[in-house]
Amino acid sequence: MPADHFLKRQAMSDFIICYDITDPRRLGRLYRYLIKRAVPLQYSVFLFRGDDRQLERCIQDAIELIDEKQDDLRVYPLPGRGLKARIGRPTLPEGIQWSGLPAKW
């Protein structure tokens, strides 16, 4: 059995996608791409929910938008039952509740 077999997820999982892009044009392109597929949490930090196939497609398309020699794109899986909390200023106005990620993949 391949070593990466245990890393494959078939169910929906949460991932943090973050980047450091050196060129403003590439930065804008990547931001516009990710904003349609994930939820922005902070500048250059997004929450992506999907299975392995969706994540791979998202990242492969994102790689096409960056310069791999100058830019940095990272993906971190979040544990399914891990603590997810926000401390500090609220992201949304009071009374507004977040119901999920964008429907369009």
UniProtKB/Swiss-Prot annotation:
GO biological process, one term: maintenance of CRISPR repeat elements
Binding-site list for Mg(2+): D20
EC number: 3.1.-.-
Keywords from the named record: Antiviral defense, Endonuclease, Hydrolase, Magnesium, Metal-binding, Nuclease
Enzyme class per UniProt: hydrolase
Domain of life: Bacteria
Coiled coil spans: none
Cofactor needs: Mg(2+)
InterPro entries assigned to the protein according to its UniProt record, in alphabetical order: CRISPR_associated_Cas2 (IPR021127), Virulence_VapD/CRISPR_Cas2 (IPR019199)
GO MF annotations in UniProt: metal ion binding; RNA endonuclease activity
A Pfam family of this chain: CRISPR_Cas2
Family annotation (NCBIfam families): cas2
PANTHER family reported for this sequence: CRISPR-ASSOCIATED ENDORIBONUCLEASE CAS2 (PTHR34405), CRISPR-ASSOCIATED ENDORIBONUCLEASE CAS2 3 (PTHR34405:SF3)
Record's function text: CRISPR (clustered regularly interspaced short palindromic repeat), is an adaptive immune system that provides protection against mobile genetic elements (viruses, transposable elements and conjugative plasmids). CRISPR clusters contain sequences complementary to antecedent mobile elements and target invading nucleic acids. CRISPR clusters are transcribed and processed into CRISPR RNA (crRNA). Functions as a ssRNA-specific endoribonuclease. Involved in the integration of spacer DNA into the CRISPR cassette.
Recorded family membership: Belongs to the CRISPR-associated endoribonuclease Cas2 protein family.
Quaternary assembly: Homodimer, forms a heterotetramer with a Cas1 homodimer.
Protein name according to UniProt: CRISPR-associated endoribonuclease Cas2 1
Provenance organism: Nitrosomonas europaea (strain ATCC 19718 / CIP 103999 / KCTC 2705 / NBRC 14298)
